[in-house]
Amino acid sequence: MDLNIKKDLASNWFKLLQNAICDDIIKLEKNKLKFKSTTWKRNKDKDEGGGEYRIIKDGKIFEKVGVNFSKVHGKFPIQFQNKIPGASKDPRFWASGISVVMHMKNPRIPAMHFNTRYICTTQNWFGGGMDVTPSSKDINEKKKFHKTLKSMCDRHYKNYYKKYKKWCDEYFYLPHRNEARGIGGIFFDYKKKDFEKDFKFVRDVGVTFQMIFNDIIKRKIKKKWTLKDKEMQYIKRGRYTEFNLLYDRGTKFGLQTGGNVEGILMSLPPIAKWK
């Protein structure tokens, strides 16, 4: 398959998914809120692509939710070329992706994160994942979440869940705190063996995330909470902020490749606290 066709298939899917997820969010908010949409360009002087990020704040369900789509191309800075597969041979790249971060008003509903991407250098691969960060323990929620992920992964390859869960546990970890960011999920990168199979998996990850966030919110939206619960949520958001600014690959990649700063930092919670 021609590389340009692969790029179009991937970026068109990410854009379609952005629209579908935003539609779901609006429905959950009873059609009473609209997204604030911002389009951006990677380079003001020449065409290097860009994207669109959409944000809702202060909803009945979502305290802040961001849904970002991007499709960019250009050259990696010299200091970044040895860190990206294939970039040392040729610094030119093309990348497209979608990222979603949900911070909830009700602290009994966990924060949720999802992203998938397709990156092309002299090599081409998919990456992404999803994870959930509750501010209070819910063992049944954790079991249900991971059962859904395992079922999805098993549709493609029996080893995926074990491999990508382990990768997620290792990735979403704060070494300076010696603690996990949340209850895990799946994380994958450098999927490049078979475009059609990998793309099918990536699409399934997106659809499964849609199903998961709708299910969690609808089951927990009427759960009562206290000010103590909210304070715990703010503290947990502090940990979330630490991870995103210190360790997150997507944040580093975006900032070092001329991405839109507001779009990159949309993942940060509206309010966070530290003890």
Task: For every predicted segment, state its role.
Residues 152-201, 216-218:
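Long, charged, mostly alpha-helical binding arms that flank functional sites
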Residues 104, 251-275:
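Long, contiguous binding/interaction regions
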Residues 122-166:
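Compact, glycine/acidic-enriched structural inserts
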Residues 94-96, 125-133, 179-193, 240-242:
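Glycine-rich, often proline-containing surface loops adjacent to acidic residues and nearby aromatics
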Residues 2-85, 191-246:
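Gly/Pro-rich turn-and-neighbor structural signature
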Residues 6, 104-106, 122, 132-139, ...:
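A generic structural motif
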Residues 80-82, 141, 197, 252-258:
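Short conserved micro-motifs at the rims of enzyme active sites and ligand-binding pockets
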Residues 51-128:
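Internal mixed beta-strand/loop scaffold within catalytic domains of large alpha/beta enzymes
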